[in-house]
A protein has these predicted regions:
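Exposed loop/turn and edge beta-strand positions of beta-sandwich/beta-sheet ligand-binding modules
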Residues: 136, 167, 183
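Short, solvent-exposed loop/turn positions at domain surfaces
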Residues: 136-142, 159-162, 371
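Short, well-structured beta-strand-loop connectors
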Residues: 142-156
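Short coil-to-beta-strand transition motifs
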Residues: 162-170
Length: 415
């Protein structure tokens, strides 16, 4: 927190200085003393006006040149945190941080360990309801008993046929589940033991135009991995985002450890950032976690083609919406994109290998004996296969985090 109104500050100081003079003037018949006091008052008011204008101009120029925020005290006066001497972790390298004073420390039992396991999963699904803005009944291009490769198109959006949704695994389409009014709820695939991928011809990121990259993301099925704010929908391909935001950490309970997620995916992450940097008229912004004793992975802190911003505070400091508000809030008529750390990696993998690979790290926590850990799996994995034979009759399963996830059964699939 810093003094926002320098005029008020100077006015207070002026009052403290002038009050004795006024008292003297009132108690004295000497007109010279009264005139002197009035001159001092006028001078201090003039100084206050000059300081106020200077402070406002300084803030405007700082914002114009992109040097405001991120913990920088762009002001004529020291911030209260400067005066109190509060320290940020040394790994922030003096870059400052957004410090969120409010929030909640949500301590729940059953936190996942940092161990990573791989569990065999037989069934996977793509759920149209996971994608906001899509038509309630998308156009299927497959039927039950069809064989598909990982990356083959399953359906597309009727309102925009260029936006395609692909299979996360290779295997057989065993069921197309429908809900109310025949809306499709799940397209279920029985996975092959050995995965097979559709291989795409990948454009050169350095040489490709923005339009060429957009077309490739649409054709390859990666486009739905991106969200458009302020309404959190699958983006309109015709719009260019003002900025792109990625929160590299989550402060929600049981969230996966970002260092575990990035481990082994460093090149894919950087490649994903390189792609995204060509899709915006502004910048790619990365929110970094400054709450821990040790620094995040250097793949996150030393990333190229993106601006990094440190955040300190309780939940929801890891929420991308909170970070957008502090870094560069959305103005009227603007749209920005957001992605998760793991979706950036998936985009990068495509440009490195040509394969639609939506492998991911999830965490399982809570009152489930012996299962609290991280797991390597693929998007849309069956929840029952992941949990195995755990006794969950009297327990509630949540797909997603505890605060914003949905109640799910063992026969359902990860979002």
């Amino acid at each position: 927190m810093r003094y926002k109104n320098s005029f008020s500050l100077v006015a207070i100081l002026a009052t403290m200085i002038i009050s004795p003079q006024v008292l003297i003037a009132q108690s004295s018949s000497n007109n010279v003393t009264l005139i002197g006091a009035l001159i001092i008052i006028g001078a201090l008011i003039l100084v206050a006006a000059v300081v106020t204008v200077s402070e406002n101009l300084l803030q405007i120029e700082a914002k114009k040149h992109g040097i405001s925020g991120n913990g920088r005290n762009v002001s004529l006066f020291p911030s209260l945190s400067d005066l109190s001497g509060s320290k940020l972790p040394s790994y922030t390298q003096g870059k400052g941080a957004y410090v969120l004073k409010k929030g909640y420390e949500i301590n729940l039992t059953g936190k996942p360990s940092d161990e990573v396991f791989k569990k065999p999963v037989n069934r996977y699904a793509v759920r149209p309801t996971n994608f906001r803005g899509i038509a309630p009944i998308p156009k299927l291009v497959i039927s039950e008993k069809d064989e598909v490769l990982a990356g083959d198109v399953l359906f597309y959006d009727k309102s925009n046929e260029n936006i395609k949704y692909c299979s996360p695994v290779s295997g057989e389409i065993v069921e197309v589940r429908r809900g109310a009014k025949r809306a499709i709820t799940d397209v279920i695939i029985l996975a092959d033991k050995k995965q097979k991928y559709r291989v795409n011809k990948v454009p050169d990121v350095n040489k490709a135009s923005r339009e060429g990259l957009v077309d490739f993301l649409l054709e390859s099925g990666l486009w739905p991995l991106i969200n458009e704010r302020p309404f959190d929908v699958v983006p309109d391909p015709s719009k260019i985002p003002s900025n792109i935001f990625i929160s590299t950490f989550s402060t929600a309970p049981y969230a996966p450890n970002a260092d575990i997620v990035i481990d082994g995916n460093e090149d894919a992450f950087q490649k994903g950032i390189d792609v995204l940097a060509k899709l915006t008229s502004g910048d790619v912004h990365l929110g970094l976690d400054a709450n821990k004793n040790s620094a995040p992975s250097s793949s996150l802190t030393d990333v190229k083609n993106a601006k990094t911003h440190w955040f300190v505070g309780k939940h929801p400091s890891g929420n991308v919406g909170v970070q957008i508000h502090h870094i560069s809030s959305i103005k009227a008529g603007q749209s920005v994109w957001t992605l998760t750390l793991q979706n950036v990696i998936s985009i990068g993998r495509m440009f490195l290998t040509g394969k639609y690979d939506v492998s991911k790290i999830i965490s399982i926590g809570g009152a489930i004996e012996g299962k609290q850990a991280h797991y390597s799996t693929v998007s849309g994995a069956n929840i029952g296969d992941l949990l195995g034979n755990s006794d969950l009759d009297e327990k509630r399963i949540i797909s997603g985090d505890v605060l914003t996830g949905r109640t799910a059964g063992k026969g359902e699939f990860l979002d």
